[in-house]
């Protein structure tokens, strides 16, 4: 029997797109014969994944996992919304979130980690799912929040299963106060994040280029009024404060009570539980944001296959 070398496995992976463990098994089953191993993988449906890799995957699920002082959000994409309702796919996304909670948010480290409940790593299990379900899929991104004391609270908007949905949010609250109350308010703020979509945690971390751009626009708008420079400066500063209220979580008006800023909500919570509460971080994953979806022109597609031009 031929030795199953790393170069043989690499060659088979490049030719088929199948996972490393599947390639090793195929070569073992075929005495190291690459061509026979390709056929073996094709019969098992595992070589099909490579053909699907070029297709746009903008659907799928966001997965959330939180435990005490840490929480994670992951996004796993597929081609159609139908796959999001598949039990195998849902189980995989939940597993990826569990791995990220343990291993951290580095996507490559997550892919290399063992996938719970399988004999494969996450990357190979993903390849297996692609072949089984028949759609291109990808582990797109992950984020993990952690505090030394306090909670990382979570919320999934319109969850289709526990911890799974199309928008997932995390809020990190640092405090030595009552954990139950921190969790309760933290979840409400996570709901706020889902609805209000803040861009920054607080004014201190607003991107300077974004702020400069906003200030330039507002200054030009104010100058058009013809008012004195001192008045214009006050107008611009007022509008900058308004800008902070729109984009900074700490400055936004809490959607639950429609009255207090988030910073005030946490100040009041700190008084209630007898310990200061710091807004330490947040994350909001919306499924498919930033992915350019293909718009199919069916007539053009058929015409291209037929070698003709569409009428019209």
From Swiss-Prot:
Start and end residues of each stretch annotated as Involved in Mg(2+) ion dislocation from EF-Tu: 80-83
Predominant localisation class: cytoplasm
A cellular component annotation (GO) from this entry: cytoplasm
One Gene Ontology MF term: translation elongation factor activity
CDD domains: UBA_EF-Ts
Alphabetical list of Pfam families matching this protein: EF_TS
Domain of life from the UniProt record: Bacteria
Keywords, comma-separated and alphabetical: Cytoplasm, Elongation factor, Protein biosynthesis
Annotated SUPFAM superfamilies: Elongation factor Ts (EF-Ts), dimerisation domain, UBA-like
Similarity annotation: Belongs to the EF-Ts family.
PANTHER family from the UniProt entry: ELONGATION FACTOR TS, ELONGATION FACTOR TS, MITOCHONDRIAL
NCBIfam families assigned to the protein according to its UniProt record, in alphabetical order: tsf
General function of this protein: Associates with the EF-Tu.GDP complex and induces the exchange of GDP to GTP. It remains bound to the aminoacyl-tRNA.EF-Tu.GTP complex up to the GTP hydrolysis stage on the ribosome.
Protein name according to UniProt: Elongation factor Ts
